[in-house]
Structure formats: structure tokens, C-alpha cells
């Protein structure tokens, strides 16, 4: 059966108990979903990808008790086939902001101009560029024949994925700019490799016979299975740590499907290449309403007659979610458990400052 022709909620009984973050309501009433504009959606998704931003833009409009006809719900959808396009950088789309297609590992070609440095200095930060960072892969480089350095135009090494281009630092902390997140997303240096795994599916671990002394610990994913991470304690973060790591990646999805519901809120799913199920990205519409209105879930059960129709309520703090693809990557390592059960997911650095 080709699930691309059916609304994903119709497949819940076939998920074999794996939580795909899909709600199962079939009536599509506005009383159950917040209304938002396309511009609001774009801002929200940017905030999801850029976890370091505050969540002030995540508020929803007042809920209206209005039922929309089925034909209006499915009037806007987009598909993207990962196997038929080069997804190296943002130039793969002419207007990615309008298409609202977000890729898991897509170089954004960030640059920091002089006025931005001045602005950061007002907040006590200094900017440092990593001169050893290789150039980001770019789809436009395929058509640029004026470049004489062939190695520079084809930075295919996986090790380059964990290299940072910009660091900002103050007396208290160091932060690295993610090269894959839209916007200027500054990640605490100690958590940088953790962010790359959860947000972009980039795994890291120390090379054999490394001189660094680290500990292997277990991390429970979604309260279910334990996976291995490596913990390094150092006086401060250094880019030399990155040179001692080996890098691997989680495969990109097979396909990307997005549709607009109720004229505003956009749902996004990607197709897992291992089990070929469609995985919900981001979060459910309900969680913001619940967080703002209810602290007691028992009260919610009593007040909401349709509570049993919801298959999942997300209780995590959105600021703890690293990126929009986080639930796809955590699903994949559980789906392909034989490969990832003993594999290190990322290196966590602990310094005096944290």
C-alpha cells in the first residue's frame, strides 16, 4: 500500500507500538487545532530549528469552534523526493522560505558581517572565525567552472560536517554557530555535538587509540532504550577535540510530505528508509494549548471529551527539542537497532563552566 495517498493518522494501527508523534483525530475541527498564518508558521519552524531562540513566537491564536470541510483541509500539500535532488545546501531551492521544505543536513552558508560583530560586542561577545573550517558543500559549485581548487569545490569528507565556522565567546561561555540551522543558531560549545546528532543526524565518537580520556555512558531515548554516548571532561572546550573524532550520519528520509490543515497549521512527515513508515516531524498542535491552559492532565481528561481521540500528547519543553528532525533521528536508531545499539551517538563535553 502506498501511504502517500492517505492521511498518516489512518496508519496508527500498523506502527507496532512505535510512537510516531501522530494524533488520530479524524474530524479536523478547529476547536482541536490552533489557527495560525503561514508567516507565523515559518517563524515557529525557524524557532524549532533554532533551539537557542526563545519561545515567545510560539503562541497561538484563540481557538474558534468552527468545523472546516474536508476539501479545505487538503488544499495545500507539497512533496519532496530526497533521492532525486542534491540537498547539500540551501541553493537547492529557489525560494526555500516560501516552499517551507526543511532538510536535515543542508548548509546555510552563514556569514557574519561587520555590523553583526558590532552588535554582538554590545552584548559582551567576541567573534572568532575558524580558519581550518573547510568550505561548505554547495550545489552551485557544480556549475562554477572558475574555481581552480577542485578539493575546495568538493568537500565530501564526513569529518567536515562537525567543523564549525564561527565561534562567539565571552568571559563565561563559548558558543558555536550551527552551519545547518536556518538563522544564526548559537549552540553552547559543550553541547554542540549533541545538537548535531539530534537536530541533523550526525554521529560522533572518539577515534581508536585517542589520547583523550573519556567515559562511556548510557542515554535513554524517549524513556525506552539505552544508547551509548561518550563523556569527556576538560577544563575548557577546544576545537582540537573535533579533530580526534570519527563521524558518521543517519540516512536522510526517502521522501518529505507536508500539508496545510485548516488553512494555516502545517503538518510535516518524512518517510523512513528502513521501515518505510511516515514519521511526524516537529510537534503536535495540542501541546501548546495544553501547556498554556492545563497543568493537571486529569482536569484535561475531564474537560475534553475528545481526549481519547488523541494518540499522543507531547509534554516535553520545546526549548529542549534540538530540531525539527529530532523525532525522525530518534525513531531511526530504534528502527535499525542492530546497527545503533552498540554505536556511540555523540560526544558530550563537560567543562568547568557547565
Swiss-Prot record:
GO terms of biological process kind: cell wall organization
Keyword field: Cell wall biogenesis/degradation
Name of the protein: Protein ECM8
Designated gene of the protein: ECM8
Superkingdom of the source species: Eukaryota
Protein role: May be involved in cell wall organization and biogenesis.
InterPro entries to which the protein is assigned, alphabetical: Rua1_C
Record's keyword annotation contains Cell wall biogenesis/degradation: yes
Keyword hit for Cell wall biogenesis/degradation: yes
Short name of one Pfam family: Rua1_C
Amino acid at each position: 500500500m502506498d501511504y502517500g495517498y492517505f492521511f498518516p493518522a489512518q496508519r496508527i494501527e500498523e506502527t507496532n507500538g512505535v510512537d510516531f508523534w501522530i494524533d488520530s483525530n479524524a474530524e479536523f475541527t478547529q476547536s482541536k487545532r490552533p489557527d495560525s498564518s503561514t508567516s507565523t508558521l515559518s517563524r515557529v519552524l525557524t524557532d524549532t530549528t533554532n533551539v537557542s531562540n526563545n519561545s515567545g513566537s510560539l503562541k497561538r491564536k484563540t481557538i474558534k469552534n468552527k468545523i472546516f470541510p474536508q476539501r479545505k483541509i487538503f488544499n495545500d500539500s507539497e512533496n519532496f523526493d530526497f533521492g532525486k535532488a542534491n540537498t547539500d545546501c540551501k541553493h537547492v531551492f529557489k525560494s526555500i522560505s516560501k516552499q517551507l521544505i526543511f532538510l536535515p543536513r543542508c548548509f546555510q552558508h552563514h556569514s557574519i558581517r561587520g555590523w553583526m560583530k558590532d552588535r554582538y560586542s554590545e552584548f559582551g561577545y567576541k567573534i572568532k572565525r575558524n580558519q581550518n573550517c573547510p568550505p561548505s558543500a554547495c550545489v552551485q559549485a557544480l556549475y562554477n567552472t572558475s574555481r581552480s581548487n577542485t578539493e575546495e569545490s568538493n568537500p565530501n569528507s564526513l569529518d567536515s560536517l562537525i567543523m564549525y565556522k564561527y565561534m562567539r565567546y565571552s568571559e563565561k561561555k563559548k558558543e558555536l554557530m550551527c552551519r545547518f540551522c536556518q538563522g544564526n543558531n548559537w549552540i553552547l560549545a559543550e553541547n554542540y555535538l549533541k545538537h548535531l546528532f539530534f537536530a541533523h543526524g550526525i554521529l560522533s565518537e572518539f577515534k581508536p587509540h585517542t589520547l583523550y580520556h573519556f567515559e562511556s555512558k548510557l542515554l535513554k531515548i524517549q524513556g525506552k532504550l539505552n544508547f551509548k554516548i561518550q563523556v569527556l571532561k576538560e577544563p575548557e572546550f577546544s576545537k582540537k577535540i573535533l579533530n580526534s573524532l570519527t563521524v558518521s550520519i543517519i540516512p536522510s528520509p526517502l521522501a518529505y510530505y507536508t500539508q496545510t490543515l485548516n488553512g494555516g497549521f502545517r503538518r510535516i512527515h518524512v518517510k523512513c528508509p528502513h521501515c518505510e513508515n511516515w514519521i511526524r516531524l516537529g510537534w503536535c498542535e495540542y501541546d501548546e494549548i495544553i501547556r498554556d491552559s492545563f497543568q493537571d492532565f486529569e482536569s484535561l481528561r475531564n474537560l475534553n471529551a475528545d481526549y481519547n481521540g488523541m494518540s499522543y500528547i507531547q509534554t516535553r519543553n520545546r526549548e529542549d527539542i534540538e530540531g525539527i528532525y529530532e523525532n525522525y533521528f530518534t525513531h531511526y536508531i530504534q528502527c535499525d537497532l542492530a546497527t545503533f545499539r552498540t554505536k556511540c551517538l555523540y560526544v558530550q563535553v563537560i567543562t568547568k563552566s557547565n
